[in-house]
Design a protein with these regions (language model features):
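Hydrophobic transmembrane alpha-helices
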Residues: 1-63, 67
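Alpha-helical transmembrane segments and their lipid-water interface positions
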Residues: 18, 22, 69-80, 112, ...
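Membrane-interface interhelical connector segments
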Residues: 75-100
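Internal alpha-helical transmembrane segments of multi-pass membrane proteins
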Residues: 126-145
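Pore-lining and gate-forming transmembrane alpha-helices of multi-pass membrane transport proteins
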Residues: 139, 167-180
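Interfacial helix-loop-helix junctions of multi-pass membrane proteins
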Residues: 153-163
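Short, highly charged, low-complexity non-transmembrane loops/tails of multi-pass membrane proteins
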Residues: 191-217
Length: 217
């Protein structure tokens, strides 16, 4: 329950923070970078402890909650503000997410998250549960790369020059992977604590990896 709540909060928070552009040294990016990688860390923890089936349900729950938030924000943005209210423009900048960007974001999230979970699950089986750090980093690279390759062309194609797209994708994936590596010691401790506390360490033997099969098997 705790991880489900935290996962959904991270996704919704990232959605809001994505509306701000920030600079870290020479690199420009969206502020969603601050929190979005946490969702991949939670994905790794849940998949490592409870398996792909539970992670699959978590991803769809996060998608549903994020979709609800974006939809309610769009409706509120569509309703005219009171005549005395001066925050209409600022509110629109946050909640007036263009359908193209919203659609690209949702598709990229689902594909990236499931790629991350699939790699994590399959590598746990092949390694007999060893090398968690390597599996966590590699699954993050796979998930984040998928997310970025889908999102940026669909959301920003034609808005920014196509020749800049590869460097933008590489920068995003690199920074998010570095984020994962920096917090990896914390992730390892969280996984160990959760396994011991819940007495769970699921291996996905015989797992059906159909993303639309909403059960634990």
């Amino acid at each position: 329950m705790f991880y489900s709540i935290l996962f959904c909060v991270c996704l919704i928070t990232a959605n809001v923070l994505e509306t701000k552009q920030i600079s870290l040294g020479p690199a420009n990016m969206t502020a969603g970078l601050i929190v979005f990688p946490v969702s991949y860390i939670i994905n790794d923890v849940v998949c490592e402890v409870w398996g792909y089936g539970r992670t699959r349900m978590l991803i769809w729950l996060g998608f549903a909650m994020n979709f609800f938030f974006v939809t309610m924000g769009a409706i509120a943005d569509w309703i005219p503000g009171a005549s005395y209210w001066e925050g209409e423009e600022g509110f629109h900048q946050i909640f007036g997410l263009a359908p193209r960007i919203a659609g690209a974001s949702f598709l990229a999230f689902v594909c990236g998250s499931f790629i991350n979970a699939y790699i994590m699950s399959r590598m746990k089986l092949s390694s007999n549960g060893k090398n968690f750090s390597f599996r966590a980093v590699l699954s993050t690279i796979g998930g984040e790369l998928t997310d970025s390759i889908i999102f940026f062309p669909l959301a920003l194609g034609g808005v920014i020059p196509w020749e800049e797209m590869p460097s933008l994708v590489i920068t995003q994936v690199t920074l998010k992977t570095v984020y994962e590596i920096i917090v990896l010691p914390v992730t390892i401790r969280v996984v160990k604590f959760t396994k011991e506390h819940d007495h769970e360490d699921v291996y996905d033997n015989g797992m059906v990896y159909n993303i639309f099969k909403l059960n634990l098997d």
